[in-house]
Swiss-Prot record:
It comes from Sinorhizobium fredii (strain NBRC 101917 / NGR234). HAMAP family: UPF0229. Residues 1-16 have a biased composition (Basic and acidic residues). Residues 1-20, 83-107 are annotated as: Disordered. It comes from the Bacteria. Belongs to the UPF0229 family. PANTHER family: UPF0229 PROTEIN YEAH. Residues 94-105 have a biased composition (Gly residues). This is UPF0229 protein NGR_c12350.
Length: 438
């Protein structure tokens, strides 16, 4: 039987194997906790660590233990004044195999705090959306970088060795340690050779010759002790990762908040906005998010008001498009910003206003936007009623004319989280760049 040894380093001195087993065991509870946090938190908070609370009863690992109401067992217990050897003790009547003094039958309400990493949060968030595996990997990757020279380092790969800086350090060290030079030693060797061939050498002459030989031997020993290139001299080219310079993008979130948009519809819309934000974050360093909500009138609001305000009323969709156009002209010129828009609605609109919406898109907004996505949130039972894309509300039919003319416009109906991802296939797939007409 083969044995597999996991030698991966544990992150931050924690047990990786135990962590993975816990995530697998408590996956449904963690998914529920993440869903609640996404529902109540900000769009930008999804792409970060999360501190998740879950009931403590779901933390312990399942174990085998003897049943408390059956079987025969022998114990060695400390002495006492109530029982003697041979006494029969009644079995405890606690249910469910609970052991220990005072074990109750109620469920513990204590909560367990668990910190999920960014990658684990995204895994749980993407699970309901049914994203392809490659798309999940791309969204979880950090921003793209390029290598840039950043000085020198004492360690590195042999292929990055800097010969010039290494020889410069070697030269300075040899000067500081007075390493004998080759010319000096060659001059002494030549002098020794000349004295050795001279005839009639006297005692003084022989003494001088011996001194030269000793000096040459001393210089050779010193030269061997001081190497030409020492490991301390070696320098390597150092590189650091520099983020690729990207342009800025602004993401407009438009949503109908009339009485017909319930909590289910708003939850699906928020998932759609979160996914679009994650896609854009992969492409741009800076992303501004503008929230515009509308009933019979529209206005720019903060995120909390956008999702949780109780305001309701009639429905005039064109007011949201007019507000978006006003904000673009005031703060986000198209020559400096990449403009993306996502509109969520149930399709209800006042009579005659849908044509006004199509006109605003045709004449103004589609010329400014890199991409405009419209999602119509319907009930799952309505998916059979709207069998073809031509059927639908007046707003859907009006937007179909825009979809036919502008390649950077995408529209779809969603009834469940798994329907959200197809909206992004055309936008982020490999395709020719969209030519926005002027």
């Amino acid at each position: 039987m083969p044995n597999f040894i996991d030698r991966r380093l544990n992150p931050k001195d924690k047990s990786l194997g135990n962590r993975q087993r816990f995530l697998k065991r408590a996956r449904e509870e963690l998914k529920r906790a993440i869903k609640e946090q996404v529902k109540s938190g900000k769009i930008t908070d999804v792409d970060a660590e999360h501190n998740v609370s879950m009931p403590a009863r779901g933390v312990s690992e399942p174990t085998f233990q003897p049943a408390g109401d059956s079987g025969e067992r022998q114990y060695v217990l400390p002495g006492n004044r109530e029982f003697a050897a041979g006494d029969r003790l009644p079995k405890r009547s606690s249910g469910g195999g609970a052991t220990g003094a005072g074990a109750g039958t109620g469920q513990s309400q204590d909560e367990f705090q668990f910190v999920l990493s960014r990658e684990e949060v995204l895994d749980l968030f993407f699970e309901d959306l049914e994203l392809p595996d490659m798309v999940k990997l791309n969204l979880k990757e950090s921003v793209a970088f390029k290598r840039r020279r950043a000085g020198f380092a004492a360690t590195g790969s042999p292929m990055n060795i800097n010969v010039g800086r290494t020889m410069r350090n070697s030269f300075g060290r040899r000067i500081a340690l007075h390493r004998p030079g080759r010319k000096e030693m060659e001059a002494i060797a030549e002098e020794i050779a000349r004295l050795e061939v001279e005839p009639n050498a006297g005692a003084k002459h022989l003494q001088h010759l011996e001194e030269l030989r000793q000096k040459l031997e001393k210089l050779e020993r010193r030269r061997r002790r001081i190497p030409y290139v020492d490991p301390v001299d070696i320098r390597f080219n150092r590189f650091e990762q520099q983020p690729l310079p990207n342009a800025s993008a602004v993401m407009f979130c438009l949503m109908d908040v009339s009485a017909s948009m319930g909590e289910r519809e708003k939850d699906l819309a928020k998932r759609f906005f979160v996914l679009l934000h994650l896609f854009l974050k992969r492409r741009y360093d800076r992303i501004d998010i503008v929230f515009i909500r509308h009933t019979d009138e529209a206005g720019e609001v903060d995120e909390n008001t956008f999702f949780y305000s109780k305001q309701s009323g009639g429905t005039i969709v064109s007011t949201a498009l007019e507000e978006m156009l006003r904000v673009i002209r005031e703060r986000y010129p198209a020559r400096e910003w990449n403009i993306y828009a996502a509109q969520a609605s149930d399709g209800e609109n006042i009579s005659g206003d849908s044509e006004r919406c199509a006109s605003l898109l045709h004449d103004d907004l589609m010329r400014l936007c890199q991409y405009y996505a419209y999602v119509e949130i319907i009930d799952e039972r309505e998916t059979e009623i709207f069998g073809t894309t031509d059927n639908g509300t007046s707003l859907w039919r009006a937007y179909r004319t825009v979809d036919g003319e502008w390649p950077n416009f995408q529209m779809t109906r969603i009834a469940k989280p798994a329907d959200i991802y197809p909206v992004f296939r055309k936008l982020f797939g490999k395709q020719p760049a969209v030519q926005v007409r002027k």
